[in-house]
């Protein structure tokens, strides 16, 4: 809700930069002539502004003259805008930003960041601030977020008050000037810049830095909000001077187009006669709509070049500033009424309406009496205040001129009465006017009430709609999660099915390949059987080829077996031409390599056994640590017993004191009885009255002293009893935690023991598998010898067959009548060879099957060995983690005990700092900033280091006070590990101007870096330790 409207003009300031090096070398003239602080003459024409800055003006002078007041206005609840306009290379970015981290050359934006927090530190401590910033640019007429480069085309929308804003822009909560500068650095690194003939760092976009400040008074619940737009506009360009081309030329076109739209808006506002202002022609003017003729206090910098080379552009810029100076803004405080304030306002208006209705009823009654001819006495007429109120709200009522009373009177009296009647009619007319005005006011209030009710109903409807949408989105989110789970399950099932089907396809393809091989062999055998005797030589050649194929198959199997074991693949010969013995020699060599691989597997099994022994040893170490934890628990139990005995002693003292109190009460009663007796006696003895009064006063004073001492002693004992009871409760809780941790460690120990047993069983199983592997190796050796014998037999048969064929060919010419007998013997030999070939094929198949079985067994064995090794590593890691967890728990428990003791002693020392609070919401993945809702937050790693060091030093000091601990020293002799964080912490406090951090609204422990004396550091602790 906006209140306190006031009209103000746009504040226009002109700043000239010095001549640059290129202009000096070119010989350009310095054309501006300055007259006073508010005017400049260019070409004989004066231009007047709110302030004109010559080239020698410093950044600090510019800031104090124009921007300092706008910071106060924003903190008071107004909206503010500062933007720079001008030609390219005229000093706009230098004016707005400058060098961010240079105290002398920093521009308006960093100085405003520091000034905001300086003002906040000096404001009322009941105020709470929320400050968030946004940084975006308008590049090629698209809004681009400089803090999130993935957001490249944001849109402009309007809120419920029809104020434009950029939807989806990143907002960062900040709590110090340094955080604002970090945000500016981050955004500035993402901004578009280019090199032109006039500027080495020419801005190619309009950048807008938005600071949104919300403040709330915690006591009155009054809320104010203010926005500050800090815009650095890109400069207008003349392509013939900048030399822009390509992408830079397109950027220049868009820049000039948006600046032209800005000029059209300012021209329309300056004329004041146009009903339409083209805010929507450009996204820049759309965003700055409230700054130009709206609810905002706006300051415009027009930056100019003093060179005669840029004479035309400078004059155009100055004319632009003069038009902007005539624009009027209506600034108002952005005040948000709370529900309680709305309710009070409603009740106030309701009471006012009720009073007005009562006044109207009285006026109507009085009017009806006047119209009926009655004379209303002065006492019954409305008072002056009521008449004035009625005059504001009454409606106009027609006057009845007919009198219902006819009286016979004299002419003088008649004239007198007519004058009286005319006067009364005049009063009636006045009353009618008052009634008319009051009725109009009532209607206006009724309309306001209806508007408020409609607003309340619409707000409730919007709230319900948002709730429904939220529930709908929640349900959709849950449904989407369920769908994702179902899809993941379906994908897992598909993956499992795919793996199974792939394995089945591989098995079927292998079987198909075996069948094809067997079919080809059978076809070859059939062809050899159907061939004629005269082709026996060709049959011999086929037999050699088949022998070579068998050898190649055997070599392939050996190669695959070697790959599985890990020796690499055997390089097969391209063609086997007769040296079969050499091939067998190669096979034997690779079989010996496989044997060496098997030996390496045995060596790995032995290493696993050694690892098992190491795991046993580590488990024993864990058992010893467990026993140490049990000893610590017993020590804590002994502490609890000693405290219990101390409590019993305190109870006994309390009982004695109560008994003494009772005896003193009895004595008091006796003394009172004696006093009564003395009073009776005093009546008889008047001369002794003065002495008795003095005795009585002395006795009363003595009793009062006894009573006060007794009460003090009782209060002190009660406090000690409460403190000891709290300590006992905390120690009991700690003991329960230690018991739980002990049970957890025992469970982990049992689990590790079970895992060790399982590992032993798996190792035995691996040993059994290794023995089976050795047996398979022996069987393979036997098969190898069998194959060698069969191949040797086949080789011999081939030689005999060749010799026999040669002999028969030689004798064929001499023994033609015996051809039939020779053919018969040849067929017998062919059948014999076929039988031998079948036997050899069976042997080969058996060898292949055995080789395949071994090939299947070996990966399983290797997989189990790898699983065992991984399990051993996992057990070692778990054991190490359990050991580290036990040590961490031990340290944490000790720290918890010391922290509880500290909390008891420093319970009443917390006080709020006398400065305004800057609240920053807490975010996941960051350390929360300090705020009224989280006063123990930290802002940097140095603060965490400082707190940890302070706590550890406090614990060390406590252990020094105890006679059983002498190992810790104070601040480790102020070592380098603790001085650096403390120095950075002290520097942060010095920069902020506070004794404590601006985000910390509590009283911390004394700073150990400021007072190295332990007696000054922890006086409370030392007093308690001494007592």
From Swiss-Prot:
Residues 906-936 are annotated as: Disordered. Pfam families: Kinesin (PF00225). Residues 9-327 form the Kinesin motor domain. One of its GO terms (cellular component) is neuronal cell body. Its EC number is 5.6.1.3. Its main location: cytoplasm. This is Kinesin heavy chain isoform 5A. Composed of three structural domains: a large globular N-terminal domain which is responsible for the motor activity of kinesin (it hydrolyzes ATP and binds microtubule), a central alpha-helical coiled coil domain that mediates the heavy chain dimerization; and a small globular C-terminal domain which interacts with other proteins (such as the kinesin light chains), vesicles and membranous organelles. The modification N-acetylalanine is found at residue 2. Residues 353-1027 are annotated as: Interaction with BICD2. Microtubule-dependent motor required for slow axonal transport of neurofilament proteins (NFH, NFM and NFL). Can induce formation of neurite-like membrane protrusions in non-neuronal cells in a ZFYVE27-dependent manner. The ZFYVE27-KIF5A complex contributes to the vesicular transport of VAPA, VAPB, SURF4, RAB11A, RAB11B and RTN3 proteins in neurons. Required for anterograde axonal transportation of MAPK8IP3/JIP3 which is essential for MAPK8IP3/JIP3 function in axon elongation. InterPro entries: Kinesin-like_fam (IPR027640), Kinesin_motor_dom (IPR001752), Kinesin_motor_dom_sf (IPR036961), P-loop_NTPase (IPR027417). It comes from Rattus norvegicus. Residues 331-905 form a coiled coil. Residues 271-361 are annotated as: Necessary for interaction with ZFYVE27. Belongs to the TRAFAC class myosin-kinesin ATPase superfamily. Kinesin family. Kinesin subfamily. GO terms for molecular function: ATP binding; ATP hydrolysis activity; kinesin binding; microtubule binding; microtubule motor activity; plus-end-directed microtubule motor activity; protein-containing complex binding; scaffold protein binding.
